[in-house]
């Protein structure tokens, strides 16, 4: 369960790959890791998270049916779906994001999944989620977004088959809107409709009907879902708002239908809803902007932009900001641990590693086969094969190539977490011992045990290590030992990509290939939004002094509107590497904003602020969002 440890920080592309491109860019399943095995385990994990009536072909044998009366008190059938993590609550927002990312993985790398014998299992995992969403959407303007609540759930430690906690259902409707929840669910059903189009066309059409209704509902009745379903706020609060989900849903509906009204929505609302303004290096269940930007870039590179090329170009610039920041070639970069893992936060950091790895993989693949070539970053070009090599390093870190030698995928390798923070896995299976485990008995008899869990949560990707690569395998260390569905979902596509045989390409040939430059066949563009010409940032040292044998530097920063005849509004700045105090800006959700008395910068006007740094190296300052009016 996220407990506000999810995606709140500053913050794919389709097309199955041609074999020639796969040979050129591919990795070998044989560089020390069995990616096909990791893929099988990662998909299997979703069966351990199932709620509802389990089918005869259930492969995780220690689980049994649960939540069989969900929704009954509300007069609706809400049996089914997924538990989000190590608890027994069904949270709609992360569940929908999970299904969206599983679907996207299949759409990009379904052939590779089929080659590994896992495509059917992956599709079954998607359908388990979409079957539930159909139930949760009984009317066009009603969507049930949660069953159970985190507060009562956390007071008990029980198997899902035994749970006695509240199963109250919570919904959004016109009087209690939830645009982010409804739009993410619309995105999930639109993406899934493409997955099932060739095998279950009737089901695919039904998903599209629900998706269109949910998008219309989300757009018409605007509001954050956690203002309506307040019990979700402390666990999956909507910190990024609903603008990213509205754009995300529109992009997926365009992909699913080719209805250009959705593309017009995406292009026409890019500024108002943040898609063309925000440059963010974090992607997850809350912040969807990088995913939207990569999808929009795909439409542009495929020649599907039509009259909206200029708007989609701005999306693409932000997508490349994300790529450059992740691979370490941006104006500001994602931090890395000493062992090389991308690092955002202590609580469930690996969710961001897997989601970023997926976006990087699809962007690199599509850039290569479309002729786009290298991504031009502030610190140098990022070739597609360099991006993929970096992705491989992140996946290998998860699978055990890290300073601890620990695999953070349960059941993979010889050394992996044994005390996963998970109710069902940590208590003896009900099939082995059907004796009822009460709310507090679970805590007294099972939660505090020093032994490993009696049931293997095979394939689960846990939260992972901290910024120093340290990890404590303890059940009560939920920040590091709890797994979540949205950790695994993006990883499916990446593992399928890595598991591909790639024509027998050897590692030494791959290394030789990385030294060969790729010709860029298209015009280059900055990875940053159009701030290089519209907004200028200049830093200067204006004073120094010594205190207690340390030298302090006073920096003056000038931010200037360089546009021609346009006023800059809603300016947001990102700041990293700051070791002292800052004056002249106000803190905001994703960085800093100008003081309230300066709501706009007219052409040629400047904003000035200062900070003190106990080192000669300046802080990194960049523009994360703005509007030109």
Curated annotation (Swiss-Prot):
Compartment(s) where it occurs, according to its Swiss-Prot or TrEMBL record: Secreted
Q: So what family is this one in?
A: Belongs to the glycosyl hydrolase 9 (cellulase E) family.
Q: Could you tell me what this protein is called?
A: Endoglucanase 15
Q: Which GO terms describe its biological process?
A: cell wall organization; cellulose catabolic process
InterPro entries, A to Z: 6-hairpin_glycosidase_sf (IPR008928), 6hp_glycosidase-like_sf (IPR012341), CBM_49 (IPR019028), Glyco_hydro_9 (IPR001701), Glyco_hydro_9_Asp/Glu_AS (IPR033126), Glyco_hydro_9_His_AS (IPR018221)
| Pfam families reported in the protein's UniProt record | CBM49, Glyco_hydro_9
Keyword Mitochondrion annotated: no
Enzyme active site: 87, 421, 473, 482
EC number(s) stated in the UniProt entry for this protein: 3.2.1.4
User: Taxonomic lineage of this organism?
Assistant: Eukaryota, Viridiplantae, Streptophyta, Embryophyta, Tracheophyta
Q: Which SMART domains match?
A: CBM49
Task: Tell me the leader sequence span.
Answer: 1-30
What domain of life is recorded for the organism? Eukaryota
Q: Which UniProt keywords apply?
A: Carbohydrate metabolism, Cell wall biogenesis/degradation, Cellulose degradation, Glycoprotein, Glycosidase, Hydrolase, Polysaccharide degradation, Secreted, Signal
Q: Which reaction does it catalyse?
A: Endohydrolysis of (1->4)-beta-D-glucosidic linkages in cellulose, lichenin and cereal beta-D-glucans
């Amino acid at each position: 369960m996220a407990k506000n440890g999810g995606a709140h920080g500053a913050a794919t592309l389709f097309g199955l790959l041609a074999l020639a491109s796969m040979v050129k860019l591919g990795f070998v399943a044989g560089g020390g890791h069995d990616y096909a095995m990791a893929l099988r385990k990662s998909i299997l994990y979703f069966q351990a998270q199932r709620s509802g009536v389990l089918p005869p072909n259930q492969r995780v044998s220690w689980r049994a049916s649960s939540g069989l009366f969900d929704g009954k008190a509300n007069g609706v059938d809400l049996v089914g779906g997924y538990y989000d993590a190590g608890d027994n609550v069904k949270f709609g927002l992360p569940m929908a994001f999970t299904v969206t990312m599983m679907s996207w993985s299949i759409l990009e790398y379904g052939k590779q999944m089929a080659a590994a014998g896992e495509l059917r299992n992956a599709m079954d995992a998607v359908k388990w989620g979409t079957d539930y969403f159909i139930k949760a959407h009984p009317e066009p303007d009603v969507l049930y977004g949660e069953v159970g609540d985190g507060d009562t759930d956390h007071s008990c430690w029980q198997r899902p088959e035994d749970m006695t906690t509240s199963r109250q259902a919570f919904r959004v409707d016109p009087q209690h809107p939830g645009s982010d929840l409804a739009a993410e669910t619309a995105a999930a059903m639109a993406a899934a409709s493409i997955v099932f189009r060739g095998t279950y066309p009737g089901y695919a059409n039904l998903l599209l009907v629900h998706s269109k209704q949910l998008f219309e509902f989300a757009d018409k009745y605007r509001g954050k879902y956690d203002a309506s379903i307040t019990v979700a706020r402390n666990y999956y609060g909507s910190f990024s708002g609903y603008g990213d989900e509205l754009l995300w849903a529109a992009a997926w509906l365009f992909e699913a239908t080719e209805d250009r009204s959705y593309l017009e929505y995406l292009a026409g609302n890019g500024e108002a809803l943040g898609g063309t303004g925000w440059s963010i290096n974090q992607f997850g269940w809350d912040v969807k902007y990088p995913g939207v930007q990569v999808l929009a870039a795909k439409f542009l590179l495929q020649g599907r932009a039509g009259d909206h090329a200029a708007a989609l170009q701005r999306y693409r610039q932000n997508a490349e900001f994300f790529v450059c920041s992740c691979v370490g070639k941006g104006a500001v970069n994602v931090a890395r641990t000493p062992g090389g893992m991308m690092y955002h936060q202590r609580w469930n950091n690996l969710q961001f590693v897997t989601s970023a790895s997926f976006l990087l993989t699809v962007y690199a693949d599509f850039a290569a086969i479309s002729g786009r070539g290298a991504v031009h970053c502030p610190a140098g070009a990022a070739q597609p094969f360099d991006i993929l090599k970096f992705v491989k390093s992140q996946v290998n870190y998860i699978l055990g190539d890290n300073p601890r030698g620990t695999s953070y995928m349960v059941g993979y390798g010889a050394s992996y977490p044994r005390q996963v923070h998970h109710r069902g896995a940590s208590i003896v299976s009900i099939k082995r011992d059907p004796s009822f485990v009460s709310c507090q008995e679970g805590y007294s008899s099972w939660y505090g045990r020093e032994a490993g869990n009696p049931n293997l949560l095979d394939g689960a990707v846990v939260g992972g290590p901290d910024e120093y690569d340290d990890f404590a395998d303890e059940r009560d260390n939920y920040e590091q030992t709890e797994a979540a569905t949205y950790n695994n979902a993006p990883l499916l596509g990446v593992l399928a990509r890595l598991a591909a045989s790639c024509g027998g390409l050897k590692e030494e040939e791959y290394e030789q290939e990385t030294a060969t430059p790729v010709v860029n066949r298209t015009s280059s563009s900055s990875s940053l939004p159009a701030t290089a010409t519209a907004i200028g940032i200049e830093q200067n040292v204006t004073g120094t002094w010594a205190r207690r044998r340390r030298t302090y530097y006073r920096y003056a920063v000038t931010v200037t509107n360089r546009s021609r005849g346009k006023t800059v509004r809603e300016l947001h700045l990102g700041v990293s590497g700051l070791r002292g105090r800052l004056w002249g800006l106000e803190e905001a959700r994703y960085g800093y904003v100008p003081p309230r008395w300066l709501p706009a910068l007219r052409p040629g006007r400047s904003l000035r602020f200062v900070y003190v740094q106990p080192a000669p190296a300046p802080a990194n300052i960049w523009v994360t969002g703005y509007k030109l009016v």
